[in-house]
């Protein structure tokens, strides 16, 4: 399984609110990471080109497209395999945190209060703070309107490695737009 495949599929699953796919991709990444440690990446240039092609086709503005592709190129020039692993690991950690927040909010809704209540909003705020996450504008509007919390409503803060900046930029521009 290629890292570029995992990166593109995590972005796609986050955008489409596909929780099952996120769980599957997290397990796939961990399985490969535990066995080979990504030592078997045959052609890192081809993999980074897949990610850049995905960015080129899904970025909504030329500015986003240019910044993302230049950032990926810069990180790739510094460390070819590390760039891909860092992006994948950042997306993976983000996905794990998002799934934990969504699961805890669903449990809260079932056990302690209805969606959109002040208690619900307070608990969501606590969950986001604990996971160093922010709600996007669309997420805030959805939560205030008592709508379902989606995977693309949450963005991770800067708590991981420096390469997570590229993963966060990918999430912001390809999955949910601007804050």
Swiss-Prot record:
Q: What is this protein called?
A: Protein P20B
Q: Which domain of life is it from?
A: Viruses
């Amino acid at each position: 399984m290629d890292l570029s495949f995992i990166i593109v599929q995590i972005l796609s699953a986050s955008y489409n609110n596909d929780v099952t796919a996120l769980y599957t991709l997290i397990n796939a990444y961990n399985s490969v990471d535990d066995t080979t440690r990504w030592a078997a990446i045959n052609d890192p240039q081809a993999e980074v080109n897949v990610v850049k092609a995905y960015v080129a086709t899904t970025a909504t503005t030329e500015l986003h497209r240019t910044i993302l592709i230049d950032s990926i190129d810069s990180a790739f020039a510094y460390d070819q395999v590390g760039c891909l692993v860092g992006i994948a690991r950042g997306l993976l950690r983000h996905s794990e945190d998002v799934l934990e927040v969504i699961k805890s909010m669903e449990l809260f809704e079932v056990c302690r209060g209805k969606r959109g209540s002040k208690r619900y909003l307070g608990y969501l705020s606590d969950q986001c703070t604990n996971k160093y996450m922010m709600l996007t504008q669309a997420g805030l509007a959805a939560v205030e309107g008592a709508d379902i919390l989606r995977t693309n409503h949450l963005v991770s803060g800067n708590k991981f490695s420096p390469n997570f900046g590229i993963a966060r930029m990918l999430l912001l521009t390809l999955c949910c737009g601007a804050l």
